[in-house]
Structures are given as structure tokens and as C-alpha cells.
Design a protein with these regions (language model features):
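Alpha-helical scaffolding within the catalytic cores
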Residues: 70-75, 97-103, 177-181
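N-terminal export signals
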Residues: 5-26
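Glycine-rich, histidine-containing beta strand-loop boundary motifs that form or position
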Residues: 10, 117-118, 148
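Short alpha-beta junction capping motif
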Residues: 34, 85-128
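An acidic, glycine-rich "communication" segment
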Residues: 42, 50, 121-207, 214-219, ...
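Aromatic-Pro/Gly-enriched surface loop or interdomain linker
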Residues: 21-85, 89-92, 200-232
Length: 232
């Protein structure tokens, strides 16, 4: 059973009252809906055009039935447990409440997939240090690993030799480093947390009308991430 199939079953098991609101898409015949997680600390609502650009690319390149709307739901809300894919980003402190921590762990251990993007592009920045500390508390200090360039996420739809660089890191934003790898946390052989210090959120945050000026569509890697999340 794929991750997407599992979470459709979970959604089907919830009461109609619980499904009312942002995740009602779970019963609307969609294969994918973009869920941004709101957390009480920090700045969760960054890169506001990124979700719509990812959604557009999924519609353009794949045959998935994609909900055209972004859904924002609190990490502390149990309805997030039915989402096939969740997104967290920010620049500032990540300090989960007990309810947020419980849902994050339950979601990932149950087979969920969370993409986490450090908008600072800084491995020593506040977001990076505090988020990694949260992951160590939940999954243990050695749970976060470097993903090799041979990882399936780089071949799930388009072909990549490794994580694509962003214009921001090439131009010296943040820690002035080009980060050669992504990190992740695996549970029972499945990648449950994908963690990036490359600031993909800012890279994909642009007016859709400017996409025609790109030599290469930089949201293709976002398509890979989603397709990987749904297929394993």
C-alpha cells in the first residue's frame, strides 16, 4: 500500500464533523492536496506563492487529480493526520507545543511525509538549530541523516543528479554555502521528513507570469518531492 492509499483510508475513517473545513478535500476525489502546517512559534506563513506554483506544476506535468487550493491547518489539529503531504517553512524559532509535537510524531510514524524548508539558508540559523533540536527530541539525536544522491527522490519523476541548487545559495544568501545534500528522517524504511537548508521555498516563490523567463522550470524538483511522497 502506498502512502497516498493509506491516508485516503485514514481520511475515510474520520467523522464528517472532523473532516469539515480545510481537509474536506480528502473526500473530494483528489489524489493530492497541498497542506501547509501552521505552528504557534516562529513565522509559518512564508513564501506565500510557493504552494500555488507547485500545484500548477503538478497539474501541468502529471496526471494526478490535484486540488487547486492550498490548505492551511494547525499542526495541533488532528485533521492534519489525513494529509498525504505536509509542508513546514520559516525563518524563526521552532518550538512545538505538546499537541504539535504529538501530532508531528504520530503523523510521521504512521507513514506521513513532511517537507521542511529552512528559509534562512543557514545551517547555524535559528530555524535550523531549533527545528533540528525538535527532531532530536522526537526521533532521537541520530535520526536525521544525509540523503545520498542515489536516493529515489531524485528519480521519482524527473531525473536529477542530486538536490538542485537555488539561485539564493549561489548568490551568497544566508550562510554563503552551497549545500550539497538534503537531510531526512526515515521510519520503517520510509522517508517521513525531508529537510532542506537550500531555501527552495523562496526559489519557488514568484509570480507565475515570470515563469516563462526561466531557462529551466525550477519547480520540477517539487514535482519529484510530491511524486515520491505519494508513491512509497
Amino acid at each position: 500500500m502506498t502512502r497516498a492509499e493509506f491516508f485516503r483510508l485514514m481520511a475515510g475513517g474520520l467523522s464528517s464533523a472532523m473532516l469539515a473545513g480545510p481537509l474536506s478535500a480528502a473526500t473530494g476525489g483528489y489524489d493530492f492536496w497541498f497542506t501547509r502546517l501552521r505552528y504557534d512559534s516562529g513565522d509559518w506563513d512564508v513564501d506565500q506563492r510557493t504552494p500555488s506554483n507547485i500545484i500548477t506544476s503538478l497539474i501541468d506535468y502529471t496526471t494526478l487529480r490535484v486540488d487547486p487550493k492550498e490548505h492551511v491547518i494547525a499542526l495541533s489539529d488532528p485533521r492534519m493526520l489525513t494529509a498525504p503531504f505536509c509542508y513546514i517553512a520559516g525563518h524563526k524559532l521552532v518550538e512545538f507545543s505538546p499537541a504539535e509535537r504529538q501530532n508531528f510524531e504520530r503523523y510521521v510514524r504512521s507513514g506521513g511525509f513532511v517537507m521542511v524548508d529552512d528559509c534562512n539558508h543557514d545551517i547555524d540559523g535559528l530555524f535550523a538549530r531549533s527545528f533540528e533540536a525538535q527532531m532530536a527530541k522526537i526521533f532521537g539525536p541520530k535520526a536525521m541523516i544525509e540523503l545520498p544522491d542515489s536516493h529515489g527522490i531524485y528519480r521519482s519523476f524527473f531525473k536529477f543528479d542530486g538536490p538542485p541548487n537555488t539561485a539564493l545559495e549561489l548568490n551568497g544568501w544566508g550562510d554563503d554555502l552551497v549545500h550539497e545534500y538534503l537531510k531526512g528522517i526515515e521510519v520503517n524504511g520510509r522517508l517521513g521528513v525531508l529537510y532542506s537548508n537550500k531555501d527552495y521555498g523562496c526559489e519557488w516563490d514568484y509570480d507565475w507570469r515570470n515563469k516563462r523567463f526561466l531557462a529551466e522550470d525550477n519547480t520540477k524538483f517539487a514535482v519529484n518531492i510530491v511524486m515520491y511522497a505519494l508513491s512509497v
